[in-house]
Amino acid sequence: MLKTIQDKARHRTRPLWAWLKLLWQRIDEDNMTTLAGNLAYVSLLSLVPLVAVVFALFAAFPMFSDVSIQLRHFIFANFLPATGDVIQRYIEQFVANSNKMTAVGACGLIVTALLLMYSIDSALNTIWRSKRARPKIYSFAVYWMILTLGPLLAGASLAISAYLLSLRWASDLNTVIDNVLRIFPLLLSWISFWLLYSIVPTIRVPNRDAIVGAFVAALLFEAGKKGFALYITMFPSYQLIYGVLAVIPILFVWVYWTWCIVLLGAEITVTLGEYRKLKQAAEQEEDDEP
């Protein structure tokens, strides 16, 4: 009887092991960690230009002046663990200096910010192994829409949330609202990854695969934030070695780790569909055998 139970358990776990083997094979073939390193490098170069463009958009709309402060604190508190305050202070200084640039310099900032989006597009389509290329004008329109509408939609959502919290009837729902706010970063990460895996690839991505891959990436991202913050707090080796410059390697390691998570979610999304196709092909071969 024990042998029968073991055989059943082995039969049920066999598809999981086959899928994990396929996932590891694709990660190795796509050089996922190298892609993550490239994206981390481009992200660090594009970080200040991207933030400068986003805050310039908020400055163009006076109604978002208060919301931009809330959005800024939300981003640094939830997406840059442990050293968010220090990084925020430095980036705000850099952005303030960039406001003194000429029109040519401002165009350079925008091009650098768009370069990050192009790199993300290229990396994800490499993982999906897509040969189809978008028209350049269409790609530019998509990048520009993300760059402009993304921050405005995020600001609008925070403004609506602040308005709802200010209503009298909301005072009776403080506990519920607190619980929702705790999981809001996870939901935001999940939705962001889902949109990334669904829209950026130039081939059709099954919606359920994108949802699963995005959920795993969101969970890893939230766990990574807490784990990274705990590591920096419990083992302050970077502060001991680099002193006041510790924020630089800490930021680089965190950005690299984040891109590893993003690309791993993409690999999971791709592998789910790939495994399903291989399984269907194997079943078809078995049916065709006499």
UniProtKB/Swiss-Prot annotation:
The chain crosses the membrane at residues 44-64, 104-124, 140-160, 183-203, 210-230, 244-264. It is found in: Cell inner membrane. GO terms for cellular component: plasma membrane. It is a multi-pass membrane protein. Keywords: Cell inner membrane, Cell membrane, Membrane, Transmembrane, Transmembrane helix. Its main location: membrane. Belongs to the UPF0761 family. This is UPF0761 membrane protein YihY. It comes from Escherichia coli O1:K1 / APEC.
